[in-house]
């Protein structure tokens, strides 16, 4: 895994960097695990924009990822490690002993030919999946379930990991990448190790066209819009926003405004909030 820089033959190349991955072993995905991915450009079923700055981009196929890891006791061999355009992490294709094929997130330290196992009795090594109750305290984990059997929802981005800090009765205490300390049921599953592609966060996009290729459209300042488009808009020339503090396009405070519901059910499971 390395970051490649370019000679500044153009203004864009002066800053741009790309990731040169020696982990990826295959360019063609497994066809049986692909489904079509329809673009909606940030629109909902009524055709209205609900997420701004989305649209265009390269066509993609969605890779079906196994987040449940429910094939307990059946060994699988790592066949390939592949690029996935739908997420920051790389993915690994597993060939199970019973003939089934599944994709998982590729953790650090996994190689083609390695044997992966899920369920009770699996060793504490990268890629294996166990319930939190079967792991020793201090284990580095990722791909964590919030509800037993629902599938992993936490710690899935490139380079991140959580740590099992303690086991208390029916719950396990986890330290998440944000610094948050959170309780999760000890029956929830998690995968051993750190998510791979750890250099992803060091890549510099470098030019606008690369963002457009990713399906991300420009973000325009409110102060250069018309007053019917944004509360900051209007005025002659470079006018001030005319308010004590910045607001969103919908008139809510833009800085320091807490958006989490005060009576959310999971509040009782958060021991301490995030530190960053």
From Swiss-Prot:
Part of the 50S ribosomal subunit. Forms a bridge to the 30S subunit in the 70S ribosome. Residues 258-276 have a biased composition (Basic residues). The keyword Signal does not apply. InterPro entries: NA-bd_OB-fold, Rib_uL2_dom2, Ribosomal_uL2, Ribosomal_uL2_bac/org-type, Ribosomal_uL2_C, Ribosomal_uL2_CS, Ribosomal_uL2_dom3, Ribosomal_uL2_RNA-bd_dom. Residues 219-276 are annotated as: Disordered. Transmembrane segments: none annotated. The keyword Repeat does not apply. GO terms for biological process: cytoplasmic translation. Belongs to the universal ribosomal protein uL2 family. This is Large ribosomal subunit protein uL2. Keywords: Ribonucleoprotein, Ribosomal protein, RNA-binding, rRNA-binding. One of the primary rRNA binding proteins. Required for association of the 30S and 50S subunits to form the 70S ribosome, for tRNA binding and peptide bond formation. It has been suggested to have peptidyltransferase activity; this is somewhat controversial. Makes several contacts with the 16S rRNA in the 70S ribosome. It comes from Clostridioides difficile (strain 630) (Peptoclostridium difficile). One of its GO terms (molecular function) is rRNA binding. Signal peptide: none annotated. GO terms for cellular component: large ribosomal subunit.
């Amino acid at each position: 895994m390395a970051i490649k820089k370019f000679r500044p033959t153009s203004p864009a190349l002066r800053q741009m960097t790309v990731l040169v991955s020696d982990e990826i072993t295959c360019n063609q995905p497994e066809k049986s695990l692909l489904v079509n991915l329809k673009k909606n450009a940030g629109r909902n079923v009524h055709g209205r924009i609900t997420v701004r700055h989305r649209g265009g981009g390269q066509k993609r196929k969605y890779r079906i990822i196994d987040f449940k890891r429910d094939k307990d006791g059946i060994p699988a061999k790592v066949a390939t490690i592949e690029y996935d355009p739908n997420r920051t992490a790389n993915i690994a294709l597993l060939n199970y002993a019973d003939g089934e094929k599944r994709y998982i997130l590729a953790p650090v330290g996994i190689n083609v030919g390695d044997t992966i196992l899920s369920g009770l009795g699996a060793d504490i090594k990268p890629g294996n999946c166990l319930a939190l109750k079967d792991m020793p305290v201090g284990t580095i984990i990722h791909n964590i379930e919030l509800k037993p059997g629902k599938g992993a929802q936490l710690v899935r981005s490139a380079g991140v990991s959580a740590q099992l800090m303690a086991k208390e009765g029916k719950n396990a205490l986890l330290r998440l990448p944000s610094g948050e300390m959170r309780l999760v049921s000890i029956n929830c599953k998690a995968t051993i190790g750190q998510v791979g592609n750890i250099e992803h966060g060091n890549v510099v996009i470098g030019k606008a066209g690369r963002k457009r290729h990713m399906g991300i459209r420009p973000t325009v300042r409110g102060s250069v819009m018309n007053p019917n488009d944004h509360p900051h808009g209007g005025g002659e020339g470079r006018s001030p926003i005319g308010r004590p503090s910045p607001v969103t396009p919908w008139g809510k405070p833009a800085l320091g405004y807490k958006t989490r519901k005060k009576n959310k059910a999971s509040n009782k499971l958060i021991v301490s909030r995030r530190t960053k």
